């Protein structure tokens, strides 16, 4: 796989790139590095996963690796990624590990580490773990007898997480009378998602909540909202929510069946927080992929947008750097820093419902303030991404595209950190212009690859 850690942990095709052998080595190296940094002879590492069929295989190997160094494991089973982050802090674990590839296809899986405070592991520690794995972990300690690590099932973990989410919701905004359609993506929120809404009094219609190990993200969830949009209209629901495979993001659907992405969610929540004096400073963090319309809508209310690279770790960095309490991505990764250390789809959807209930408006009315500029996003699969993008033909095409889009447009070219894909996004006043510049860029890439 080359470099192991990408922007979101270690990912690859399960049993081919992300093998049980690699999971075992990550368990050994991770527990050793963390034990050394916290000077603990017996670290406790919390482990969760999503619903992929390969999760059991990788979990068994990972846990074996951890226990082989003398560290103990707290297993929480199938839970959302943000639940693992929260529970790591809640149980004072040395670190948390989640086995998931989020919104990626079934064949993929991933292993991601969280530090004891619930934040993603710092780059330096990931590098230490990676170096140790690549060098080989055969020489690391192998305790015997009672010093071998134990595995503990944390049966109450799920309820601890749900209780915390409910504590983040304004108790005077009961959801009785609200109808919500919840698309669980046959993923990690298949159980916690519907129960959360039921406990708050909403009428819940759950879809894609019967995972079988192979149907995660299959024509459902936050990247495929067609079924959810139909269900919202059919049931005359007040809102629809689509989580992804590990429920660290969500997309919302209004009562008319229109999809509201992360830009809409940021605007709705930022305006509400600002009106109540809770957005201090009056600032949000958003990635370069956000629509220019978000900037315009927020600046009307004197709220600034701090821009950053794509990836929730970069959103978090920008939030810490700027003091922003709210930040996120168009894809639906939203961070409420007063409540969570990472993007949490369940928490985000609750916060939108809170605004819906408090305002007395419909979701379509709340979203009306965001007038999006036309946008075109294409994903191009290619190997040697950096080499191709640096080619003079491609560089010249990108330069000409930026000139054509002008000051009211935006061009973003971003190699994916987890897939052999380059994402090209163009925004501007006219759709035909976007189609032309994207076509010219694609043509230059094809010529560079020839």
Curated annotation (Swiss-Prot):
Organism: Syntrophomonas wolfei subsp. wolfei (strain DSM 2245B / Goettingen)
Residues the record lists as Phosphoserine modifications: 102
Function comment: Catalyzes the conversion of glucosamine-6-phosphate to glucosamine-1-phosphate.
Cofactor or coenzyme needed: Mg(2+)
Protein name listed in UniProt: Phosphoglucosamine mutase
SUPFAM superfamilies per UniProt: Phosphoglucomutase, C-terminal domain (SSF55957), Phosphoglucomutase, first 3 domains (SSF53738)
Catalytic activity: alpha-D-glucosamine 1-phosphate = D-glucosamine 6-phosphate
Cofactor: how bound: Binds 1 Mg(2+) ion per subunit.
Domain of life (superkingdom): Bacteria
EC number of the protein: 5.4.2.10
Disulfide bond residue pairs: none
PTM section of the record: Activated by phosphorylation.
Sequence similarity: Belongs to the phosphohexose mutase family.
Binding site for Mg(2+): 102, 244, 246, 248
Key words, A-Z: Isomerase, Magnesium, Metal-binding, Phosphoprotein
Biological process per Gene Ontology, one example term: UDP-N-acetylglucosamine biosynthetic process
Positions annotated as active site in the UniProt record: 102
GO molecular function: magnesium ion binding; phosphoglucosamine mutase activity; phosphomannomutase activity
One Gene Ontology term, aspect cellular component: cytosol
Tagged with keyword Phosphoprotein: yes
């Amino acid at each position: 796989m080359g470099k192991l850690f990408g922007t979101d942990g270690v990912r690859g095709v399960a049993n081919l790139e992300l093998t049980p052998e690699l999971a075992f080595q990550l368990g050994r190296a991770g527990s050793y590095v963390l034990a050394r940094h916290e000077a603990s002879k017996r670290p406790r590492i919390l482990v969760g996963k999503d619903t992929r069929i390969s999760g059991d295989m990788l979990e068994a190997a990972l846990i074996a690796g951890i226990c082989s160094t003398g560290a103990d494991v707290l297993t929480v089973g199938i839970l959302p990624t943000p639940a693992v982050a929260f529970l790591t802090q809640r149980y004072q674990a040395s670190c948390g590990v989640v086995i998931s590839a989020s919104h990626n296809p079934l064949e993929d899986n991933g292993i991601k580490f969280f530090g004891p405070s619930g934040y993603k592991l710092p780059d330096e520690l990931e590098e230490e773990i990676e170096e140790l794995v690549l060098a080989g972990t055969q020489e690391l300690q192998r305790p015997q007898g009672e010093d071998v690590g134990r595995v503990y099932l944390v049966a109450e973990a799920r309820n601890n997480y749900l209780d915390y989410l409910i504590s983040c919701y304004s108790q005077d905004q009961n959801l009785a009378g609200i109808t919500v359609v919840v698309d669980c993506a046959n993923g990690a929120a298949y159980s916690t998602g519907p129960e959360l809404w039921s406990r708050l009094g909403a009428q819940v219609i759950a879809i894609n909540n019967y995972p079988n190990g192979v149907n995660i993200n299959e024509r459902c969830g936050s990247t495929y909202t067609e079924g959810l949009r139909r269900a919202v209209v059919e049931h005359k629901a007040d809102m629809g929510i689509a989580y992804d495979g590990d429920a660290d993001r969500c997309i919302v659907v209004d009562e008319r069946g229109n999809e509201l992405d992360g830009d809409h969610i940021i605007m709705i929540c930022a305006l509400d927080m600002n009106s109540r004096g809770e957005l201090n400073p009056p600032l949000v963090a958003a990635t370069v992929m956000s629509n220019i319309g978000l900037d315009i809508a927020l600046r009307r209310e004197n709220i600034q947008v701090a821009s950053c690279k794509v990836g929730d770790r970069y959103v978090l960095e920008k939030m810490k750097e700027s003091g922003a309490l709210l930040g996120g991505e168009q894809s639906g990764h939203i961070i409420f820093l007063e409540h969570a250390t990472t993007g949490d789809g369940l928490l985000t959807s609750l916060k939108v419902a809170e605004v819906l209930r408090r305002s007395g408006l419909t979701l379509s009315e709340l979203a009306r303030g965001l007038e999006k500029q036309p946008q075109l996003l294409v994903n191009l699969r290619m190997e040697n991404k950096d080499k191709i993008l640096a080619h003079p033909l491609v560089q010249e095409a990108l330069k000409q595209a930026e000139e054509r889009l002008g000051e009211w447009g935006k061009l973003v070219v971003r190699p994916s950190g987890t897939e052999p894909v380059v994402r090209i996004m163009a925004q501007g006043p006219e759709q035909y212009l976007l189609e032309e510049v994207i076509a010219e860029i694609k043509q230059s890439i094809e010529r560079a690859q020839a």
